[in-house]
């Protein structure tokens, strides 16, 4: 039986396409690279940004890391606000919590941004944990999920009671 539900943020709890795509475009323009098509730009949503810059723009690790820094120049003050909650999501989280489910966020997005976004949309009161990538990490999703499980006091023996919603 499921007792704990982990949610991803981008594309699950929120529609963050506009802010992410606009910030990726900003970074690519600043780096002087050719602009990928819209379908490719949408692939930046979800995975760690450095990996996406390397895969979809052909950047080496150093250039991709600069791309992430430039992305954040725009995303932190502007892009995170070009975002909206999925319709009915706050109410859904409240209902799930009221039914006894333990809810948590697990995102490869930096944790400070996860906290800010969850607070803005009113998700935080429903969450037992809001967990993102630590500052300076590469945003590995498996590491984030392990961190959430540790924060919730869950072990491998509990895995059959956990559901992940999103990527």
Q: Could you tell me what each predicted segment is?
A:
Residues 20, 49, 85, 138-141:
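Conserved donor sugar-nucleotide recognition element shared by glycan-biosynthetic enzymes
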Residues 77-105, 111-115, 142-143:
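Short, acidic loop-to-helix structural element flanking the phosphoryl-transfer center
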Residues 112-163:
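Substrate-recognition "cap/lid" segment bordering the active-site pocket of phosphatases
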Residues 1-43, 54-57, 61:
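Active-site neighborhood of HAD-like aspartate-dependent phosphohydrolases
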Residues 106, 165-166:
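Short beta-strand immediately N-terminal to the catalytic nucleophile in serine-hydrolase-like folds
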Residues 54-90:
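Metal-dependent phosphoesterase signature
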Residues 16, 166-167:
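Acidic di-acidic motifs
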């Amino acid at each position: 039986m499921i007792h704990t539900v982990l949610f991803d943020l981008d594309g699950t709890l929120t529609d963050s396409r506009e802010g992410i795509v606009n910030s990726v475009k900003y970074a690519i323009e600043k780096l002087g690279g050719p602009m990928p098509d819209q379908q490719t730009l949408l692939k930046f949503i979800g995975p760690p940004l450095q990996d996406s810059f390397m895969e979809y723009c052909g950047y080496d690790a150093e250039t991709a890391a600069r791309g992430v820094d430039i992305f954040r120049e725009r995303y932190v003050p502007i892009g995170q606000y070009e975002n909206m909650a999925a319709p009915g999501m706050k109410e859904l989280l409240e209902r799930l919590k009221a039914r006894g489910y333990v809810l948590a966020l697990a995102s490869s997005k930096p944790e400070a941004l996860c906290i800010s976004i969850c607070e803005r949309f009113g998700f935080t009161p429903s969450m037992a944990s809001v967990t993102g990538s630590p500052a300076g990490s590469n945003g590995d999703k498996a590491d984030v999920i392990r961190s959430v499980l540790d924060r919730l006091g869950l072990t491998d023996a509990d895995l059959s009671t956990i559901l992940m919603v999103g990527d």
